[in-house]
From Swiss-Prot:
The gene is HSP70-14. This is Heat shock 70 kDa protein 14. GO terms for cellular component: cytoplasm; cytosol; mitochondrion; nucleus. Belongs to the heat shock protein 70 (TC 1.A.33) family. HSP110/SSE subfamily. Residues 509-526 have a biased composition (Basic and acidic residues). The modification Phosphoserine is found at residue 533. It comes from Arabidopsis thaliana.
Length: 831
């Protein structure tokens, strides 16, 4: 069972795996830990990760990046519209109101959803993990931003399904960081809580998390974020600065040229890193646009000045995180900063001023999220034993449930007022389950929605659940218990609906135990029937207080059933009441999510595209094999193979090799795998015999020596007068001698035949034949010459006396297969 953590970043991705010795961040095919989050579509295949990044400059319009900014968001989202303006590829609105990505793939225009593209990237990361673990990877843990909405979380799960992964948990990136920080700490306090602020300034966003640590546990106290404050925003500031400067000085508009924009953005990113350590940074780009070389220079003070609008936004999430946690700056003991954007000196200055202490960098800014994800996966996996460490996560949003009256009442206009109650308030633990009790006479629906969308910029309604049909046996309004679950991924769903009906059952009650039995039954019925009692229905009390909908709104006062309970309590002879539970069907509609059929189709398409990629890679390998064979054989024919082929054959073969080389760069540049395989086999028909003759000449001497040594060894042993061979019969020794003579004669004849042949002729004596002869000789002679001496049988001792008999009895050594009776009989006869 695999234990893998994926940090899917906006710019780069990392893969961490859990092994017996700890957590390792693994290397990709290019021996890098970071894999660019880029999918490039080509005319014949896709290029993903590092290969995609290498193709971006040459193919910008078909290179898809910043996938996390697109997934699970409506096309009309203002933030998405701002992001699209800086993207080199085409993004349009789909029929469902969500973005579609357009690219040329296999020579035709294709449209992909962001979920599909993320699935492609996850599939590539899965391959990296499998190559390092040498096993299939299915179970994993994926890091997501804390601000991801319910729909975005579902989209990540769909992308994982497309990639053939099964996430055990979607964990917030800051929570993963806190886990990686705390699980290795051995000095955490047992009573007093250690409060640590984790600030992640990534490529596109800023996330703040305040966590409280105690020995063996961490508790997330608050989350805060700014979705559009990251390292790329500083890059964009520099890009706009130099684009305007070049427009004035060189009369070129970089923003109108996709390749020029990519080159300038890449240079600005490097410039930002230079300014992190130096007060001044130069910029030089050759042939940026219209064959013009551009130059520029910027000081750190100037950079910070043009970045003021970004820097002013840094304090807001910090203040909100402290406010939600109910802490002051003095209550925060340490500040840990991670992420690529945190290297800007102005950011560190603001953090230092706000917290009154220098931020620490004790964690690897790039790898800590992936390590935390792998640790969380190991904790959830039954195959790994991990140090006991509890993670108490909190939900960053407030979720409410809304409903109207029953369907029959809605038709009559009896349920015009929308009722709602908060089921999962902000900061609610993850996972969690709440139960609500409804009184309905027919099918009805409930909506899962955000209580506050001010910080979300997302539609308030998440999903709608239709509950029913059902029918009460009494013809009255039925009582239904609806369970709402907030799972480990942070996804809210209505889990089940149960119809609760009381029915009376005649039970013969003995006088002795009547009171006790009735009391127990009464308590059980009361616990299940009372709408506002019991731990599992605690949410009913909240719902009643908030909207007063589930009880009196439906015309059935909640106290109506209580006298029945009291009556049952007071009468020992009353019939027993049972609560009959019936599962009620419910249907789910998640707004904007992919349907199951659509996910299955996406899985099939991903399989087809992966197969195409694999075929193209194998085709490249075969083509490279042909090219390599041509160069290698040409060099050897002029060197070590020269004596093993005739002059005429060599000239013809060299001409054939040159012809194949020309074909590779002309007509054969774009052929199928089978054509390259056939071409290589055609060349090997001529080249392999030459190679065989060369190898035979190298190996022949050593194998002949081995056979000669074998012949001489057995001949000497057969003719030896050594006493250790005296037990072997002469006839057997003669057989060995005859076999040695025959092998020697065969070898001599073959050697004479081989000596008359030129090196370019087919060998008469093959090393494989010599090895076989030596093995056959050894197989025949070894059993004869290593036959053990026969073991002399012990003579039965003469029974001259009891003492002698005892000595004869104890003298022979008795193995497990010995027959003791022969030794014991004389002793018995002498007594």
């Amino acid at each position: 069972m695999s234990v893998v953590g994926f940090d899917f970043g906006n710019e780069n991705c990392l893969v961490a795996v859990a092994r017996q010795r700890g957590i390792d961040v693994v290397l990709n095919d290019e021996s890098n830990r970071e894999t660019p989050a880029i999918v490039c579509f080509g005319d014949k295949q896709r290029f993903i990760g590092t290969a995609g990044a290498a193709s971006t400059m040459m193919n910008p319009k078909n290179s898809i990046s910043q996938i996390k900014r697109l997934i699970g968001r409506q096309f009309s989202d203002p933030e998405l519209q701002r992001d699209i303006k800086s993207l080199p590829f085409s993004v349009t609105e789909g029929p469902d109101g969500y973005p579609l990505i357009h690219a040329n793939y296999l020579g035709e225009k294709r449209a992909f959803t962001p979920t599909q593209v993320m699935g492609m990237m996850l599939s590539n990361l899965k391959g990296i993990a499998e190559k390092n673990l040498n096993t299939a990877v299915v179970d994993c843990c994926i890091g997501i931003p804390v601000y991801f909405t319910d729909l975005q979380r579902r989209a990540v799960l769909d992308a994982a399904t497309i990639a053939g992964l099964h996430p055990l948990r979607l964990i917030h990136e800051t929570t993963a960081t806190a886990l990686a920080y705390g699980i290795y700490k051995t000095d955490l306090p047992e009573s007093d809580q250690l409060n640590v602020a984790f600030i992640d300034i990534g490529h596109a966003s800023m996330q703040v998390c305040i966590a409280g640590f105690k020995k063996g546990q961490l508790k997330i106290l608050s989350h805060a974020f700014d979705r559009s404050l990251g390292g790329r925003d500083f890059d964009e500031v520099l890009f706009n600065h130099f684009a305007a400067k070049f427009k004035d000085e060189y009369k070129i508009d970089v923003s109108q040229n996709a390749k020029a924009s990519l080159r300038l953005r890449a240079t600005c990113e490097k410039l930002k890193k230079v300014l992190s350590a130096n007060p001044l940074a130069p910029l030089n780009i050759e042939c940026l646009m219209d064959e013009k070389d551009v130059r520029g220079v910027i000081k750190r003070e100037e950079f910070e000045e043009i970045s003021i609008p970004i820097l002013e936004r840094v304090k807001r999430p910090l203040e909100k995180a402290l406010s939600d946690a109910g802490l002051t700056v003095e209550d925060v003991h340490m500040v840990e900063v991670i992420g690529s954007g945190s290297r800007v000196p102005a950011m560190i200055k603001i953090l230092t001023e706000f917290f009154g202490k220098e931020p620490r960098r004790t964690m690897n800014a790039s790898e800590c999220v992936s390590r935390g994800c792998a640790l969380q996966c190991a904790i959830l996996s039954p195959t790994f034993k991990v140090r006991e460490f509890q993670v108490h996560e909190s939900f960053p949003f407030s979720i409410s449930l809304a409903w109207k009256g029953a369907a029959s009442e809605a038709q009559n206009g009896g349920a015009e007022n929308q009722q709602s109650t908060i089921v999962f308030p902000k900061g609610n633990p993850i996972p969690s389950v709440k139960a609500l009790t409804f009184y309905r006479s027919g099918t009805f629906s409930v909506d899962v929605q955000y209580s506050d969308v001010n910080d979300l910029q997302a539609p308030p309604k998440i999903s709608t659940y239709t509950i029913g049909p059902f029918q009460s046996s009494k013809g009255e309004r039925a009582k239904l218990k609806v369970k709402v679950r907030l799972n480990l991924h942070g996804i809210v769903s209505v889990e089940s609906a149960t119809l609760l009906e009381e029915e009376e059952v005649e039970v013969p009650v003995t006088k002795e135990h009547s009171e006790e039995t009735t009391k127990m039954d009464s308590d059980k019925a009361s616990a299940e029937a009372a709408p506002a009692s019991g731990d599992c229905d605690v949410n009913m009390q909240d719902a009643k207080d908030t909207s007063d909908a589930t009880g009196t709104d439906n015309g059935v006062p909640e106290s109506a059933e209580k006298p029945v309970q009291m009556e049952t309590d007071s009468k020992a002879e009353a019939p027993k009441k049972k609560v009959k539970k019936t599962n009620v069907p419910l249907s789910e509609l998640v707004y904007g999510a992919l349907k199951t059929v659509e996910v299955e189709k996406a899985v099939e398409k991903e399989f087809e595209m992966a197969l195409q990629d694999r075929v193209m890679e194998e085709t490249k390998d075969r083509k490279n094999a042909v090219e390599s064979y041509v160069y290698d054989m040409r060099n050897k024919l002029s060197d070590k193979y020269q004596e093993y082929i005739t002059d005429s054959e060599r000239e013809a073969f060299l001409a054939n090799l040159q012809e194949v080389e020309d074909w590779l760069y002309e007509d054969g540049e774009d052929e199928t795998k089978g054509v390259y395989v056939a071409k290589l086999e055609e060349l090997k028909k001529v080249g392999d015999p030459v190679e065989v003759r060369y190898k035979e000449s190298l190996e022949r001497g050593s194998v002949i020596d081995q056979l000669g040594y074998c012949i001489n060894s057995y001949r000497e042993a057969a003719m030896s007068t050594d006493p250790k061979f005296d037990h072997i019969e002469l006839a057997e020794k003669q057989k060995v001698l005859n076999e040695c003579v025959e092998a020697e004669a065969w070898l001599r004849g073959k050697q004479q035949q081989q000596d008359t042949l030129p090196k370019y002729a087919t060998p008469a004596l093959l090393s494989a034949d010599v090895k076989s002869k030596a093995e056959a000789l050894d197989k025949f002679c070894r059993p004869i010459m290593t036959k053990p001496k026969p073991v002399a049988k012990a003579e039965a001792p003469q029974a001259k006396g009891g003492e002698q008999a005892d000595e004869g009895k104890s003298e022979p050594e008795q193995p497990a297969s010995a027959e003791p009776m022969e030794t014991e009989n004389p002793a018995e006869g002498s007594t």
